[in-house]
Amino acid sequence: MQSVLDAGIKKYGRVIADIDTGEIVKLMDSYDMPEDVVYVAGDEKLENTQIHKVMEESIYGGCPVQTGYCNGHNQKLNALEYHRSSEVNIAATDMILLLGSREDVKDDFTYETSKVEGFFVPEGTAIEVYATTLHYAPCGVDGQGFKCVVVLPKGTNLDVVNTHATAEDKLLAASNKWLIAHEDAHIDGAFNGLRGENITV
């Protein structure tokens, strides 16, 4: 297990060290941590914070974003996804990210889970996950739950009409979201392209 503060993260993203995450991390204290995993693409209270404004005006260069959250309990890889844009994660608790490189996805859209690397993310850390990085829901530390703020371009992860223009479309699980699942995760409608162990942390 590496840390996002180590040099190894540079392949997958970067720590955004010069922004204040204190307000939004404190706000996340009031949000539930369910036994399963819950994702909300955009949350009104989170989008009324100063850091949401910083994300739009600075990190995303003036483009509109949505600020939501992913909370719960998870210890498994289950799937990997990617977007056409960076995603910013802000750890509202300590958590672990399991990351891979899109360049390692084969032409048939399969991916060997042995290539996945795990990174510890300390509470309060903001990390930009590059568009070329495979990722999914965080994992908790030592069996504990996690809370994570998720920032993406506005309109990401919404319902999408199925299309069949290119072979990659079979991975399209939501708007701006391409998903490769592990068969053991039993994700309805997903393409089961992860090969090897469904990693547990």
Model-derived features with residue positions:
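Active-site region of the double-stranded beta-helix
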Residues: 1-123, 137-145, 149-201
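Aromatic-residue-lined binding/catalytic grooves and analogous aromatic/hydrophobic interfacial grooves
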Residues: 129
